[in-house]
Amino acid sequence: MNCKPLILCTFVAVAMCLVHFGNALPAISHYTHKRFDSMGGIDFVQVCLNNCVQCKTMLGDYFQGQTCALSCLKFKGKAIPDCEDIASIAPFLNALE
């Protein structure tokens, strides 16, 4: 029995699926671009998110934790908030009355 046509059809079908659904898969570079410092072993996005949680715990309703977390993801951890530095957390503060 000649299996070459079956193998060729399977290969073509897999290739078509990859082409069709390839855009749905995230690009690897999206997750590795300046997110992780390979020399120091630091994941900047994770540090940023942890600091957002810490600030939310410390400041409660005065701090917009979700907005802080979204900015960590959007900017890939480039602007890490420091709960004791008013300038770094100013965009996430609420003025409650």
UniProtKB/Swiss-Prot annotation:
<dbReference type="GO" id="GO:0008255">
    <property type="term" value="F:ecdysis-triggering hormone activity"/>
</dbReference>
<dbReference type="GO" id="GO:0005615">
    <property type="term" value="C:extracellular space"/>
</dbReference>
<dbReference type="GO" id="GO:0008031">
    <property type="term" value="F:eclosion hormone activity"/>
</dbReference>
<keyword id="KW-0964">Secreted</keyword>
<dbReference type="InterPro" id="IPR006825">
    <property type="entry name" value="Eclosion"/>
</dbReference>
<dbReference type="GO" id="GO:0007562">
    <property type="term" value="P:eclosion"/>
</dbReference>
<dbReference type="Pfam" id="PF04736">
    <property type="entry name" value="Eclosion"/>
</dbReference>
<comment type="similarity">
    <text>Belongs to the insect eclosion hormone family.</text>
</comment>
<dbReference type="GO" id="GO:0018990">
    <property type="term" value="P:ecdysis, chitin-based cuticle"/>
</dbReference>
<feature type="disulfide bond">
    <location>
        <begin position="52"/>
        <end position="68"/>
    </location>
</feature>
<keyword id="KW-1015">Disulfide bond</keyword>
<feature type="disulfide bond">
    <location>
        <begin position="55"/>
        <end position="83"/>
    </location>
</feature>
<feature type="disulfide bond">
    <location>
        <begin position="48"/>
        <end position="72"/>
    </location>
</feature>
<dbReference type="GO" id="GO:0005184">
    <property type="term" value="F:neuropeptide hormone activity"/>
</dbReference>
<dbReference type="GO" id="GO:0007563">
    <property type="term" value="P:regulation of eclosion"/>
</dbReference>
<feature type="signal peptide">
    <location>
        <begin position="1"/>
        <end position="17"/>
    </location>
</feature>
<protein>
    <recommendedName>
        <fullName>Eclosion hormone</fullName>
    </recommendedName>
</protein>
<dbReference type="GO" id="GO:0007218">
    <property type="term" value="P:neuropeptide signaling pathway"/>
</dbReference>
<keyword id="KW-0527">Neuropeptide</keyword>
<keyword id="KW-0732">Signal</keyword>
<comment type="function">
    <text>Neuropeptide that triggers the performance of ecdysis behaviors at the end of a molt. It triggers adult behavior patterns: larval, pupal and adult ecdysis, and plasticization during the molt.</text>
</comment>
<keyword id="KW-0372">Hormone</keyword>
